[in-house]
Amino acid sequence: MDIGRAFSFVFQDPAWIRKILLLAVMFFIPIIGWLIIGGYTLRLIKNVIDGVPQPLPEWDNWGGDLGGGLKVLVVGIVWGIPIWIITAVLDAGDNWFLGFVSWLLSVGWSAVQMSAMGDLARAGNIADAFSMKVVNRVLNNFPIWIVYILGTFVFGIFSLIGLIGLIIGIVITASIAIAATAHLGGQAYRLSEGAAVPAQPRF
């Protein structure tokens, strides 16, 4: 797992400015744009899993990204239901410890959801994202997914830097953070499946 690489790969793509700006523009298009973001990041995850040297996708499959985003939405909702129920029960009581446990479960569950996205990205079939292997992959490779979770915290903090530039700044840094999180998730999935992450290309 390489958190630094998950961040730096964006800037090693010759067309990264255009690709990130288009990703940022999608934030301003309600629903359709947000779904396209989901489909685009799904392609990014697949590229990392497949070992593509420059995994940041080209913006050349708008319809496919929209359809992929719908699949991401369905997978996210279905896998979100168990943790929503558990956290609702834990948060119902006025107990700080149960609240802390609820938070930990929510954080940990993000790894399970990324594991499901990896199956969806690799197979393209939404049914592949709904099996116990999604959970087992995380449990059997827990150290790898801990690094993924830590990385998402780092990228989340980075995205807040954009607040300095107000709305435009935050969507740019958020777009980079989304790409970095997808890359790290692809790394975690690939390593969990027993494949080494390819060496970083030199430019």
Regions found by a protein language model. Name each.
Residues 35-39, 56, 60, 64:
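Generic alpha-helical scaffold signal
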Residues 34, 50-54, 72-75, 79:
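Short helix-loop boundary/capping segments at the starts of domains
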Residues 2-27, 59-85, 111-161, 185-187, ...:
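Interfacial aromatic "cap" segments that immediately flank transmembrane helices
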Residues 27-50, 91-129, 152, 156-196:
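Selective recognition of hydrophobic, aromatic-rich stretches within alpha-helical transmembrane segments
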Residues 46-60, 86:
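Membrane-helix interface/capping segments
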